[in-house]
């Protein structure tokens, strides 16, 4: 399990979970416009949170959640020896900042790097990064021997959200299918704002398939 990290994430989740019946919806500034079916998303989000909190809740510093795709935390991203052992060729950092991750950190390892400066806040618009992150993951896995680590600080919210979006955009999984696929290998807890944005993406993709 992730020492300390999962306990922190679980406490954070329970705080969200316990308030689900009393809070009115919060508009995510600049986020994808939600279609009518998710304009009042708490029931849908509540059900997703219940799904997220069932089944596998353990995690390692990195878990392979899709062939060649590892979801992990900052500690594994800093461990060059472990990155070599796993054969990582690309790193997507969803908690990029001047203090956390730069391309220079992987000089000499032959690792391609993409940083997304995201905040683990329900008000943060992660949806603007969905396509670019999914494209980067796809390019990594399309090259021979390509393996990618997608990480943030803990590896359960920001990075997990981008992995779910990738599975939806490139493999046409529904959001529920993507969550179940990832949770077969790692416990994740995207924050409520990220879940709303994923629901909006899910609806848009489903409408596109039906058109």
From Swiss-Prot:
SUPFAM superfamilies cross-referenced by the UniProt entry: (Phosphotyrosine protein) phosphatases II
PROSITE patterns from the UniProt entry: TYR_PHOSPHATASE_1, TYR_PHOSPHATASE_2, TYR_PHOSPHATASE_DUAL
Catalytic residues, chain numbering: 152 (phosphocysteine intermediate)
Tyrosine-protein phosphatase domain span: 60-207
Superkingdom in the source lineage: Eukaryota
InterPro entries hit by this protein: Atypical_DUSP_subfamA, Dual-sp_phosphatase_cat-dom, Prot-tyrosine_phosphatase-like, Tyr_Pase_AS, Tyr_Pase_dom, TYR_PHOSPHATASE_DUAL_dom
Catalytic activity: O-phospho-L-tyrosyl-[protein] + H2O = L-tyrosyl-[protein] + phosphate; O-phospho-L-seryl-[protein] + H2O = L-seryl-[protein] + phosphate; O-phospho-L-threonyl-[protein] + H2O = L-threonyl-[protein] + phosphate
Pfam families from the UniProt entry: DSPc (PF00782)
Entry keyword set: Cytoplasm, Golgi apparatus, Hydrolase, Nucleus, Protein phosphatase
One record GO biological process: negative regulation of MAPK cascade
Disulfide bridge partners, by residue number: none
Transmembrane segments annotated in the record for this chain: none
Signal peptide: none
Enzyme class: hydrolase
GO molecular function: MAP kinase phosphatase activity; protein serine/threonine phosphatase activity; protein tyrosine phosphatase activity; protein tyrosine/serine/threonine phosphatase activity
SMART domains, A to Z: DSPc
GO-annotated cellular components: cytoplasm; Golgi apparatus; nucleus
Physiological role: Inactivates MAPK1 and MAPK3 which leads to dephosphorylation of heat shock factor protein 4 and a reduction in its DNA-binding activity.
Subunit description: Interacts with HSF4.
Protein name: Dual specificity protein phosphatase 26
Organism encoding this protein: Bos taurus
Species classification: Eukaryota, Metazoa, Chordata, Craniata, Vertebrata
């Amino acid at each position: 399990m992730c020492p300390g990290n999962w306990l922190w994430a679980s406490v954070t989740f329970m705080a969200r979970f316990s308030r689900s019946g009393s809070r009115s919806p919060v508009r995510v500034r600049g986020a994808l416009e939600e279609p009518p079916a998710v304009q009042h998303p708490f029931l849908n989000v509540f059900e997703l949170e219940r799904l997220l909190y069932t089944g596998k809740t353990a995690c390692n510093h990195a878990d392979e959640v899709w062939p060649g795709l590892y979801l992990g935390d900052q500690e594994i991203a800093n461990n060059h020896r472990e990155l070599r052992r796993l054969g990582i060729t690309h790193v997507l950092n969803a908690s990029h900042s001047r203090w956390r991750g730069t391309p220079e950190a992987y000089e000499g390892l032959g690792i391609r790097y993409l940083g997304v400066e995201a905040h683990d806040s329900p008000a943060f618009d992660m949806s603007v990064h969905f396509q670019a992150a999914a494209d980067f993951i796809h390019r990594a896995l399309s090259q021979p021997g390509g393996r990618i680590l997608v990480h943030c600080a803990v590896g359960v919210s920001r990075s997990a959200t981008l992995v779910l979006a990738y599975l939806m955009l490139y493999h046409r999984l529904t959001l529920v299918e993507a969550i179940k696929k990832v949770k077969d290998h790692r416990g994740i807890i995207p924050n409520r704002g990220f879940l709303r944005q994923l629901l909006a993406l899910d609806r848009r993709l489903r409408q596109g398939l039906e058109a």
